[in-house]
Amino acid sequence: MLTSFKINKLFGLYDYDLVFSESNDDKIRFITATNGYGKSTILRLIDAVFNHHLEFFFKIPFHELTLTVDQAVLNLRRVKNAVSTPPEAMEVVDKDEDYAIEFSIGVDHLASTTLTLEDVQSESKELDEVLQQIEMFFSSETCKFIDDRRLLRENTDASELVRLSDLLKERLLHPDDNTEKQIAVLMDIVSRSCFADKHIEISKAFGFRFVMDNEDRTKLAMYDLSSGEQHIMLISLYMLFEAPEKAIVLIDEPEMSFHLSWQGDYLKNLRQIVGLRNVQCIVATHSPIIFDSEYSLAIDLYAQMHPEE
């Protein structure tokens, strides 16, 4: 479980100390702030650690980052790479290759490895060492990043829904003790969401599909669903049927494709899923409706930067 994330001088300015979970019963958090405070960037930095996108750390200005998973601590420091560029050139403009990232595991930072951008791009021995350390300490964690803005730009998640429908079909053909409960939660969420003039059908023959409530009972392709409908199905199916134990699901601005009534049900949907599955969910949002104004679940980045207000 991701318990905390601390970053100093994000974009050269912001210092944040985010506590995500304090117990096994505390697995949902919402990161909120106005535009420009780094909500989405924080999700991408977390994703970059767990999914080994280390080149991303050279693109984002920051001084130090500390991420805690259960009892394991990973620390990253962005330092000047003196061998890449003469000092007089570094004073003119900062480029990705002007920096190195120092990785260390543990609270004492006794053992550390420093990577340059060239190390990452050339898949050097030093990169292998860092990846092995990350894998050793965080091997039990899986991280999934769902970007709602990409849902609005592209329709690639329709093909992802086809894959998840096939997965559901396999689960129906080979059920376990939880399958019936998982199906019940999925049906609750779809029913609560009131998809417009359509209903879901679930079968061992095809997994799931949506059918229009017309005389012809027109069967819909996945790409016929709206971006909001796709998002609800994608999140629900992944977290209910595919996410392994202890999975961390990162969701970026789900309200962008949701009507206000759907936003009001979002926390209820997440709680129903998290209550059944041992997964953790971290959501970046502008909308307090998404977390039903339960501010105990929210981390306000603006408030951390302006505690006096």
Model-found features: residue ranges?
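Phosphate-coordinating catalytic segments in nucleotide- and nucleic-acid-processing enzymes
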Residues: 52-224
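Switch/communication elements of ASCE P-loop NTPase nucleotide-binding domains
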Residues: 1-79, 203-309
